[in-house]
């Protein structure tokens, strides 16, 4: 995103496309309230109104035509979202009305906002750190309760506060280390260096451990169902969904291509992938489906390996990579058992036996033990910065005091990258590139 024109007054429609009860045209910048004067007619001019107030009146075109009745909300910088003067013109959510109101605002001197420019200005004004800015986009896109909760925590500054606590431990250690090197006669106690650094490492290790959960909560997870033909993959998919999405027959090889379906499992957005049954076959079409099933399993966040518990156990003909996350499921638990395995979950798609336990196991496998009330790392950018900080702290703990200082300084730089207090422009641009225009 270009940084030119940041002193311009900008405007955009801030509500989603399509018809709605209410629509908003947002204006921000030094001339925002003066421009609102020209587009809004009420008992008082927006420019003569104190911040935090709203006015009722009419939205008007340049020739005086009344476009709609609505509200003008007035915010004065720095006490606004962007830190600048802001006017929000609220109308009925007709696309035609909003287009005319925006056109009038642009006629009066505003320029169209670029994607994410309102939030970029909030970041540059110090109203948000970079992690909070990312949380704005995550909150807009949140499709489940877990995603919403994490985005709200991020927007509240909870992640930044967590990072600042870690940085305070590192800073305290660095200060004690510097004092010991500069004034050895003062006898700085060892615990002044070791205790806070150990605390920083423990807290940062826990934070890094939330990265998988955070990214799964925000972008969702792909869950592949694999097994031999007639292992019950399609039946289990239908049972988890609560409706018939996949065709189920007693004929082996019914599923030859993969099939996807979306659902929310305990607040986590999940894409279920029903795959072809794994077996040696001379049918080229079915063989292609088998190869595809293995590829889908290798790229999935979690694999459910299904085995028919009512038939003699026959392990899969294909090997999955060692790092593949998987849960073993013994299907058809309503039928007499031909074998048992304490490491497998017993499930019946017919009676529903074990489905609740399976859902819980899937949630645990995807989210782990990340504390629900804590802020998580929700982007790869955040996770990378946290891992770098942890690496430098671990290096510092293994080095002599006269060499550890450099590693601690690098750890602080990585933590500053995480919150955006010290980050390069191209990284900031990459964050805001995915925003919609009205944000």
From Swiss-Prot:
InterPro entries in the cross-refs: G_TrmE (IPR031168), GTP-bd (IPR006073), GTP-bd_TrmE_N (IPR018948), GTPase_MnmE (IPR004520), MnmE_dom2 (IPR027368), MnmE_helical (IPR025867), P-loop_NTPase (IPR027417), Small_GTP-bd (IPR005225)
Binding site for K(+): 230, 249, 251, 254
Compartmental location: Cytoplasm
Stretches assigned to the TrmE-type G domain: 220-367
EC number(s) given by UniProt: 3.6.-.-
Entry keyword Metal-binding: yes
Residues holding (6S)-5-formyl-5,6,7,8-tetrahydrofolate: 26, 88, 127, 439
One Pfam family linked to the record: MnmE_helical
Entry keywords, A to Z: Cytoplasm, GTP-binding, Hydrolase, Magnesium, Metal-binding, Nucleotide-binding, Potassium, tRNA processing
A GO cellular component entry from the record: cytosol
Co-factor: note: Binds 1 potassium ion per subunit.
Example GO molecular function: GTP binding
Function: Exhibits a very high intrinsic GTPase hydrolysis rate. Involved in the addition of a carboxymethylaminomethyl (cmnm) group at the wobble position (U34) of certain tRNAs, forming tRNA-cmnm(5)s(2)U34.
NCBIfam families: mnmE_trmE_thdF (TIGR00450), PRK05291.1-3 (NF003661), small_GTP (TIGR00231)
Oligomeric and partner information: Homodimer. Heterotetramer of two MnmE and two MnmG subunits.
Matching HAMAP family: GTPase_MnmE
Protein name: tRNA modification GTPase MnmE
């Amino acid at each position: 995103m270009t940084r030119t024109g940041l002193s311009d007054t900008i405007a955009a429609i801030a509500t989603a496309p399509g018809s709605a009860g209410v629509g908003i045209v947002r204006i921000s910048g030094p001339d925002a309230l003066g421009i609102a004067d020209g587009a809004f007619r009420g008992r008082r001019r927006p420019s003569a109104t104190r911040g935090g107030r709203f006015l009722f009146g009419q939205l008007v075109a340049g020739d005086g035509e009344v476009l709609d009745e609505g509200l003008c909300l007035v915010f004065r910088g720095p006490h606004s979202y962007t830190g600048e003067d802001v006017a929000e013109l609220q109308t009925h959510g007709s696309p035609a009305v909003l287009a005319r109101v925006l056109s009038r605002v642009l006629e009066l001197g505003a320029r169209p906002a670029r994607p994410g420019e309102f939030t970029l200005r909030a970041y540059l004004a110090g109203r948000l750190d970079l992690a909070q800015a990312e949380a704005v986009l995550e909150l807009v896109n949140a499709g489940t309760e877990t995603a919403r909760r994490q985005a709200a925590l991020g927007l509240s500054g909870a992640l930044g506060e967590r990072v600042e606590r870690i940085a305070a431990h590192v800073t305290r250690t660095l200060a004690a280390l510097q004092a010991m090197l500069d004034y050895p006669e003062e006898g700085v106690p060892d615990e002044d260096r070791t205790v806070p650094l150990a605390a920083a490492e423990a807290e940062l290790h826990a934070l890094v451990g939330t990265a998988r959960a955070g990214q799964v909560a925000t972008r969702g997870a792909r869950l592949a169902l694999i097994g031999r033909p007639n292992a019950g993959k399609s039946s289990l998919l239908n049972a988890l969904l609560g409706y018939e999405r996949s065709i189920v027959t007693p004929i082996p090889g019914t599923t030859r291509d993969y099939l996807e379906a979306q659902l929310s499992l305990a607040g986590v957005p999940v894409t279920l992938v029903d795959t072809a049954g794994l077996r040696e076959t001379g049918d080229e079409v079915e063989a292609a489906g088998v190869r595809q099933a293995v590829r889908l399993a290798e790229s999935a966040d979690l694999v459910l390996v299904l085995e028919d518990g009512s038939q003699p156990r026959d392990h899969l003909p294909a090997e999955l990579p060692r790092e593949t996350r998987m849960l073993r499921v013994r299907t058809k638990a309503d039928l007499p058992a031909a074998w048992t395995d304490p490491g497998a979950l017993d499930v019946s798609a017919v009676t529903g036996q074990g489905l609740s336990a399976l859902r819980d196991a899937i949630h645990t496998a995807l989210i782990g033990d990340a504390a629900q009330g804590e802020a998580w790392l929700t982007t790869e950018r955040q996770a990378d910065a946290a891992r770098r900080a942890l690496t430098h702290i671990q290096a510092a703990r293994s080095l002599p005091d006269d060499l550890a200082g450099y590693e601690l300084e690098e750890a602080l730089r990585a933590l500053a990258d995480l919150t955006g207090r010290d980050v390069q422009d191209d990284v900031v641009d990459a964050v805001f590139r995915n925003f919609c225009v009205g944000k």
